[in-house]
Amino acid sequence: MNSFMTVGLGHYLAVAAVLLVLGIFGIFLNRKNVIVMLMSIELILLAVNLNMVAFSASLGDLAGQVFAMFILTVAAAEAAIGLAILVIYFRNRGSIQVEDVNLMKG
């Protein structure tokens, strides 16, 4: 096999670092839209999962890959619940801006 076409651990870590930085920038640069903030959190979780799978494959241990599947399942449930809460909030208030969420009454 040609060594030029192999993808090593460093490549996976670089992609995960880019995903992590994009997620962090998405949270800090866009503080107005809640949906964009949720997508940025999902990008951060995806970066963590990619790191876990890359290190697990590099070390030859399947435990990290199985744990990454559990994290993906929890992240999918978290996204579904978060979007359902946002839909209900939008129906009640007519907006999902972060400033409007901060003005909730108890």
From Swiss-Prot:
Pfam families cross-referenced by the UniProt entry: Oxidored_q2
Biological process annotations from GO: ATP synthesis coupled electron transport
Subcellular localization: Cell inner membrane
A single MF term (Gene Ontology): NADH:ubiquinone reductase (non-electrogenic) activity
Major subcellular location class: membrane
EC id: 7.1.1.-
Gene3D superfamilies hit by this protein: 1.10.287.3510
Keyword annotations of the record: Cell inner membrane, Cell membrane, Membrane, NAD, Quinone, Translocase, Transmembrane, Transmembrane helix, Transport, Ubiquinone
Subunit-level organization: NDH-1 is composed of 14 different subunits. Subunits NuoA, H, J, K, L, M, N constitute the membrane sector of the complex.
Name of the protein in question: NADH-quinone oxidoreductase subunit K
